[in-house]
Amino acid sequence: MLLLPSAAEGQGTAITHALTSASSVCQVEPVGRWFEAFVKRRNRNASTSFQELEDKKELSEESEDEELQLEEFPMLKTLDPKDWKNQDHYAVLGLGHVRYTATQRQIKAAHKAMVLKHHPDKRKAAGEPIKEGDNDYFTCITKAYEMLSDPVKRRAFNSVDPTFDNSVPSKSEAKDNFFQVFSPVFERNSRWSNKKNVPKLGDMNSSFEDVDAFYSFWYNFDSWREFSYLDEEEKEKAECRDERKWIEKQNRATRAQRKKEEMNRIRTLVDNAYSCDPRIKKFKEEEKAKKEAEKKAKAEARRKEQEAKEKQRQAELEAVRLAKEKEEEEVRQQALLAKKEKDIQKKAIKKERQKLRNSCKSWNHFSDNEADRVKMMEEVEKLCDRLELASLQGLNEILASSTREVGKAALEKQIEEVNEQMRREKEEADARMRQASKNAEKSTGGSGSGSKNWSEDDLQLLIKAVNLFPAGTNSRWEVIANYMNIHSSSGVKRTAKDVISKAKSLQKLDPHQKDDINKKAFDKFKKEHGVASQADSAAPSERFEGPCIDSTPWTTEEQKLLEQALKTYPVNTPERWEKIAEAVPGRTKKDCMRRYKELVEMVKAKKAAQEQVLNASRARK
């Protein structure tokens, strides 16, 4: 039934009768706020009471927005629209008293109120003067709403809120009233945290866990504060892509620097608070007392345990000492017995050798002229060096119990056997040397002037160079070859392959062949320097055993001690070499001086040879 209002005075009421048509079926689509509420409840699977609570919440927010009182900004009309970036946007909209806590509804309501009050059209209608374009102060209101209505831009402005206190209390300020000074500082800085439920500073009754959680949170503070609002250049003003990239790069660098300064400020705040916190001092004292008590208890338990172990250890040490003394005594007796046997053997050999010399001397060395006598003396000395004790005793018995002819025959037979043995050894060594030379020639191709004509001087020079440039020298064989080419008098140029081949063949030589090489070199030395060979034709010389110069090679440890001593005692140190010798056990002053000279000569020779190799390589380049 449709009810219409009654007609006004002076108007007539007309009744129109229309013919009603037959009923028809039509589709009706539900709309309206009540249907919307029904759909929300169904989608949330909520009851009507829940929806009523939601509606009440929205109504309460709207009522709060309506109750919000805006503060008039007295400097609003004096603001420069061109300098809008330096204005306080909250104060412009009248929200200076709520600032970052203002909701979007409040910001929107504040903007609406400011528009209704300060819109240029309304002021123009009221007769107020209006500036043209964007020069009117109303532009500042528009910019403020533009910044605060956008969550990203609002976050950027909140990060540089001009009313925020960035100061950090010093240690002296909080010496007596720590909680009153630092509590509000941490409270206002907690707004920058990305994490919710920021822990409070607490009081003197806070537990260790709460205090530790508080400082752990702030030492690992995760701040959302950023400084894009302070960018000096706006990339939107760039004329080209390159300029926009340059502006973005400059802005990123500036933001990163300001972010670093902000984190340093937070770190300084936490450091100052931690150093002044009386609870930290209390916890440290409690921890120290606890550790001291535990330490004393452990020390007492350790002392008792140590006493028991010490008694057992002393008993074990005594048993070990007795066993060791017994073992050492046995070893000493064995060594003494071995030394006695060795001395007896040595004396017996020496006695038999002297007896052989005397027997031969008594028979005038079985010779009638001086030349044969000298030759026989050499052969006798050879027998003394080569024969064993049993052979010497047997030969001496024959000489002592036989006639001159029988003794001479026995002596000559023994000499012949020794010479034959030496000859065989030499032939075997020569065969090995020839085989080694053939192998070396095969490995080097069997040609080249460097693989032949190795004189005695070149062999000695090679041995000297190998000793002078030990393994580990950079380009060792090239350096050795260059050294030989510089110092060799043969004029034959040697390559690194020639030197390597000859060095390998020398390593395979028999010891007697090495002695022959050294002997030939010494004979040449005597010939060049005019050293006359001296021989006593009257009697064989006697050899006396006495102290000789220590030719023991220097070990790595001794070398290190020598080098350290040379650094410790400089040249101007009085009695320098005596002190150096004391620092190197087992070495005399002469040993240290001789080793030092060898090292100096070795370094000089290495430098010279390496310079030659370097110059040669540069010349080839």
Swiss-Prot record:
Listed transmembrane segments: none
Keywords: Acetylation, Activator, Chaperone, Chromatin regulator, Cytoplasm, Nucleus, Phosphoprotein, Repeat, Transcription, Transcription regulation
GO biological process, one term: 'de novo' cotranslational protein folding
Region (ZRF1-UBD): 160-250
Residues found modified as N-acetylmethionine: M1
Changes after translation: Phosphorylated in M (mitotic) phase.
Region (Disordered): 422-453
GO molecular function: chromatin binding; histone binding; Hsp70 protein binding; ribosome binding; ubiquitin-modified histone reader activity
Biased composition (Basic and acidic residues): 422-433
Tissue and organ expression note: Expressed in all tissues.
Gene Ontology cellular-component annotations: cytosol; nuclear membrane; nucleolus; nucleus
All copies of domain SANT, residue ranges: 449-511, 549-604
Subcellular localization, as worded in the UniProt entry: Nucleus; Cytoplasm, Cytosol
Keyword Metal-binding: no
Domain notes for this protein: The ZRF1-UBD region specifically recognizes and binds H2AK119ub. The ZRF1-UBD region is also involved in protein-protein interactions with other proteins, suggesting that it may be masked by some regulator, thereby preventing its association with H2AK119ub.
Biological function: Acts both as a chaperone in the cytosol and as a chromatin regulator in the nucleus. When cytosolic, acts as a molecular chaperone: component of the ribosome-associated complex (RAC), a complex involved in folding or maintaining nascent polypeptides in a folding-competent state. In the RAC complex, stimulates the ATPase activity of the ribosome-associated pool of Hsp70-type chaperones HSPA14 that bind to the nascent polypeptide chain.
Subunit structure: Component of ribosome-associated complex (RAC), a heterodimer composed of Hsp70/DnaK-type chaperone HSPA14 and Hsp40/DnaJ-type chaperone DNAJC2. Interacts (via ZRF1-UBD region) with ID1.
Official protein name in the record: DnaJ homolog subfamily C member 2
